[in-house]
């Protein structure tokens, strides 16, 4: 399509080489300790539980109907109690749009959300609570009102001209006409794509990452639309040039801050694609295959979706070093996918929070907020209580909250052990207190019934049985085959970590376990985590 796509990245390499990259990924073993089990220290994001926030909709503290940084600061106690220990803020920069994915100034914060001092205060208060904060980094494109683009568009001789992608004639894909030729903007005309074949653009982006990591002190970035960075010859996604650019980017930002974390959005990626980007290009990728597995197995009452997602992961990403989620800000809210079915919402949360992979919870998911597209309606004000405007603001919000807020809200669910909020809280704390649930190996088991999902999580810290009845009917026809798990030891006790009831130890005769039926009948949507004591 365009010859300039074949530029080499030599200049970029030179640029990043000056930054004396520090090797970072190598885990350092803990010094001798009195604890029996010693493990290599994991990067902080491997054991985190993230919470995605749309700032505009979280909490308004200055009565303008728009959520703000101070609002998040005021709600940090809520988030800490919930148990999350990392936050992803959707775009916080000045922008002409309500969502912020078209940036006007990468060095400033959106004045509607507060001042830079407000933002720094949020960072400090979060740090006090051991909560990490990452922000959206929108690098594929700027706003068409960004000063770079205004200059590039009005003056073809400007050095900013080559910050973007131009052609005399519209080619394949999304080209937009101006007085001085056509520019490429994959998503829409208001978002002109940056030209990463131009080392100057790469230099600008690294200045921006350095500013946020080292001047401001954030912990990393969620990198937007990462598969679209560099188009080559009409190929618009996942090009070798994009991968090459990301490899240099990885070296550069790790040199700026060895503890910095990036997670890339590769929309729709399953484990085989996640694998290509992870480790040498970005720290994490969202695994959409796992997400569909959690949601579809729950919705359909059959284990095939989650079982195949896990099998794909075992093949391509056996350490499950990726991020998981149920739905995000680009998808209908998961409670709407489940038509308001509380049992299903609880089941999906259980599947995600007992599986390996770093979970991301979308704000409001934990109380069962609903929302279906258009996009504005999946990003509505958080429902804090039954007061007017859902307790989000004292004035009419930027967009009205869902009408169910009088029943569905944080205040109503807090302390109610049957609520979705307390279910999330219990599962998050269970995960944090049992590192096996975070990062251990997962071994799928067969129970002879497609309505049952059962696996063992096994590492040096313990052996945990995760068991769920995905259906709305009781199941008594089942038996778990523990022999598939390759367990060497016998067990003398069980500890019920999640779920009601008492159960017995799996019996072993000789080399093999008897078929295991921890409960005669599994109630509809029953969920258990049982620790086996050797
Ligand atoms: Ca406000
Ligand atoms: Ca692009």
Question: Regions from the language model: what does each represent?
Answer:
Residues 14-38:
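Ser/Thr-rich, Proline-interspersed low-complexity disordered segments
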